[in-house]
């Protein structure tokens, strides 16, 4: 499979890799997938309460600098998991 992530490669998929080595056209879809996963998890946890999920979507898709802030955090914490960094930024912004 071309482009498949194997367990050996998954360990190398650090925030630094995403920020510095991943093809620029692949970064946004990859990061938006993380955001969508976190938002959907919050939606399941929160049930009919949609405030946190709405905050997540607003933060990522509508706030001007959210994507740039994510990339800056990835560059700063290069050895961390991308999902953990996005989750921390969401928790800080949306009190999730």
Please describe what each predicted stretch is.
Residues 12-17, 24-25, 40-96:
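Compact alpha-helical subdomains of small soluble proteins
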Residues 34:
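Globin-like tetrapyrrole-binding proteins
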Residues 1-3:
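Bacterial N-terminal signal peptides
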Residues 5-10:
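Sec/Tat signal peptide C-region and signal peptidase I cleavage site
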Residues 37:
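Cell-wall glycan-active module
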């Amino acid at each position: 499979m071309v482009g498949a992530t194997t367990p050996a490669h998954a360990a190398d998929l650090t925030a630094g890799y995403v920020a510095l080595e991943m093809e620029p056209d692949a970064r946004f879809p990859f990061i938006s997938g993380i955001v969508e996963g976190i938002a959907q998890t919050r939606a399941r946890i929160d049930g009919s309460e949609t405030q946190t999920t709405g905050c997540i979507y607003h933060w990522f898709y509508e706030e001007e600098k959210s994507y740039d802030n994510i990339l800056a955090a990835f560059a700063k914490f290069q050895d961390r998991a991308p999902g953990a960094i996005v989750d921390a930024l969401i928790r800080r912004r949306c009190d999730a």
